[in-house]
Amino acid sequence: MSKSIEKMISHLKNQGFVFQGSEIYGGLANSWDYGPLGCEVKNKLKKVWWDFFVKKNPLNIGLDSSIILNSKVWKASGHIDGFNDPLIDCKNCKSRWRADKLIEEFDPSINTGIMSNLQLEEYINQNNIVCKKCQKKDFTQIRKFALMFKTNQGVLEDDSSIVYLRPETAQGIFINFKNVQRSMRKKLPFGIGQIGKSFRNEITPGNFIFRTREFEQMELEFFFDPNDSNDWFKYWLEQIEIFLTQKISLDKNNYKIRENLKDELAHYALKTSDIEFNFPFGWGELWGISHRSDFDLKVHQNLSKEDLTVLKEENNQKILANVIEPSVGVERLMLAIFWQAYTEEQLEENNSRIVLKLPYNLAPYQVAITPLSKQLNQNANQLFLELLKDFDAIYDETGNIGKRYRRQDAIGTPFVITYDFQTLEDQKVTIRYRDTMKQERILISQLKDFLNSQFN
C-alpha cells in the first residue's frame, strides 16, 4: 500500500489531530486548528524540546517575550527594510507567486538567493516560465512584498502607533539579553531558549502545516565569547541530531545535513547549516542552525544606545557576545513526525490497517484499557482510573475488540490492555503492542512497572 500526503491529512482530520481553521465559514487559507489529539502531540513535543535544550542543559535558561514589540526592534534587526519576498502577479488569472519559487521549481539548481529582482525577472522571461495555475506567460513586474503583519496599537491609527506581529521569536531574546544576564548572574557561554508564536504574511504558504502564516518556533540563542576555543556550532549541531534520533526517534535515513554555500548565507550569518527532511513533496528545511556573529547585539546596542557588552573578569575587557542559533518550527517538526509515523499495512486475509507509529513519548495516549465484555466494564474502568494517575490513558468499551484495536492503532496508542474473564481468576490482563500486534499476559500488579519500563 502506498501512502500519500492527501491520505495522511484526511486521516489526521478524521482522528482529531488537525482541523481546517474556521471550517464552518468556508475555512481560511493555510489556517489549521489542532484538535484534542493534535494539541497533545504538540504540547508533548514542545515539552521534550524544552526539557532537552533548556531544563536539562546546565548552560541554558528560558524566556517568554512579547509577541508585539516596539517597532524600533524591527528597524534595528533589518526586518522593516529587508524582510520581504519578490511578488509577481499573473495578469491572465490574477494569481500571485513568489518569483524565486517559480524559478526554483523550474530549475532546482538555480540559487535565487543571490539574484536581484531584475535578475529574477529576466530569468523568468528568458526561460519562458509560465503561471502554474493557467499555464500562461503574462506576468507583472516583480515588486517587494512585506512579510510582517502590520497593525496599530492604541486609539489613533497613524505612523506613531504602527506595530508588528513578530516574524520570529529571536529578537525578543536579543533585546532581553542584558536583563537575563544580569538577573540570573550568567557568565559566557550561556543560552536563552524560547517557544512562541510567530507570524509571516507569506505569499504562497502551503504543503499542509509545512508553511503557514501563523506558526510556533522553538529557538535557542547561545551566547559565547568570540575568542572561545570551543566549536559551539559543531556542539549544537550534534545536540540537534541527538534530539532528532534519540528524543523523537526520527530515522537518520529521512534527513540530511546541508551546509549553506557562502552566497546563500543571510546578511547576519557567518555559517549556516540546514537539517533537511524528506517530506512527501520532497526535501525541505526542517531545522536551521546559524552562526549569527555579534550582529544582533551590535545593531540593538547601536540603535538603543544601551550597553549590551559583557565584561571579561580576567582582563576587564568588554566584549559583544557571538551567537549560535538552532531554530525549528513546531508544526514543521510535527509534519515530519506524522509523515514518518503514518503507516498503511496489508495484513492477512485481505485485511489492512492504518497505524500511527508515533514515538512513545509523543503519542496522545500511552495506553488504552478495554473490557472484553460489558459484564467487565466496572472492573476495567477501575483499572483505567488507577492507571490514569500515572499515565496518559483512555478507556474504550465501544464496538468489538478488533475495532477497538484498530481505533487505537489509528491514533498511535502504543499499548492496549484487555480485561477479560480470565483476569478475574488469575489477575492477569492481555497487553497488545501497537507496532507488532503481539500480545502477552501480565499481572495487574506488574502493569505500572512494565509501562514505566517502556516509556522511560
Swiss-Prot record:
It comes from the Bacteria. GO terms for cellular component: cytoplasm. Keywords: Aminoacyl-tRNA synthetase, ATP-binding, Cytoplasm, Ligase, Nucleotide-binding, Protein biosynthesis. Substrate binds at residues 98, 168, 215-219, 325-329. GO terms for biological process: glycyl-tRNA aminoacylation. Its EC number is 6.1.1.14. It is found in: Cytoplasm. It catalyses: tRNA(Gly) + glycine + ATP = glycyl-tRNA(Gly) + AMP + diphosphate. One of its GO terms (molecular function) is ATP binding. It holds the Pfam family HGTP_anticodon. ATP binds at residues 200-202, 210-215, 285-286, 329-332. Belongs to the class-II aminoacyl-tRNA synthetase family. Catalyzes the attachment of glycine to tRNA(Gly). HAMAP family: Gly_tRNA_synth_B. Homodimer. This is Glycine--tRNA ligase. It comes from Mycoplasma capricolum subsp. capricolum (strain California kid / ATCC 27343 / NCTC 10154).
